[in-house]
């Protein structure tokens, strides 16, 4: 079992190159299944979840190669297998995205019910019901979702009862090769959906309205090859901005876009931080000041992202004042608070709200990561706590943060990865 040993307290300052967004790379990799010709993707992050996706694609018969520059070539022209198996899918919920492209192009697909982070219910029901409205026949059998269609799927009006990034992406992929026009109402508006639509359109799809709550897709008969650069990771960007805010530092995030992160930047400014933006950089300068407490309510984009909630929990537990953080997207997403409390934080959980009473300093402790974003908040807590903090279960971090130790060391953190042969 791998762990991080983090020494503190240190001020985190410097420049960080932001990686491609995991939450765009994964759906785009699965969407490449729709193309009859090879596609080339650049800015694909080097992550566990990306590797798992490569393995799933290869299991389907897709040729996947990453060259020395990091570019990924995907050739789905010779797919000969239509099942995404349990042993791969169990580690990653995003694997449900294999289903829509398979049934859209080959009229059949099977995906094991997925795994991933343990942050409450993330049902696949909306993916399934939307495909059924487009003419797919769905069976749930022995832990697998099996989808078939009699010829091409057909366009439909799909109203999302709840704003869902995953289901919006599934429908968008399926609709590209459907007969007729599909309209998604109450669609998710995340930048990663916009990026996936840009990729699909580069392959010849006809998608309009991505980034708004109504997306229209006119089906085409086939999709062809293209080149596409994955959008920068706004959550990684936000994470490093928070690192500067909580440590009294100044960090510039390079190769990123401020317009994908407006709610987060607004809250950082409200916390008393100076944030300056250019076309492709965002800089946070704390001026050595302690942040002020800010209330947070997670919402679908363009609201405050749930994937930044844990980082702002850390900010609030070391801020001046008391704050309330309300989580409206996922259940059970405050598992980092008891761990932060072990480090001297004063956080309470009341249902879907956390109340944070700011303290001046954290102290080191042994803590355990519970999901991807919680884990990075514990690592940053270790960077600003006095003494040596051990963070366990860091495999969560490797799912979503590329070369995290190198990037943290580059801004002044003292962090090392080590292995224990067995769990005590």
Curated annotation (Swiss-Prot):
Gene Ontology cellular component annotations, sorted alphabetically: cytoplasm
Enzyme kind, highest EC tier: transferase
InterPro entries, per the entry: Enolpyruvate_Tfrase_dom, Enolpyruvate_Tfrase_sf, MurA_subfamily, RNA3'P_cycl/enolpyr_Trfase_a/b, UDP_GlcNAc_COvinyl_MurA
UniProt-annotated catalytic positions: 117
Main location as per UniProt: cytoplasm
Pfam families membership: EPSP_synthase
Catalytic activity: phosphoenolpyruvate + UDP-N-acetyl-alpha-D-glucosamine = UDP-N-acetyl-3-O-(1-carboxyvinyl)-alpha-D-glucosamine + phosphate
Sites of 2-(S-cysteinyl)pyruvic acid O-phosphothioketal modification: 117
Function: Cell wall formation. Adds enolpyruvyl to UDP-N-acetylglucosamine.
Family the entry assigns: Belongs to the EPSP synthase family. MurA subfamily.
Protein name: UDP-N-acetylglucosamine 1-carboxyvinyltransferase
Protein source organism: Actinobacillus pleuropneumoniae serotype 7 (strain AP76)
Gene name tied to this protein: murA
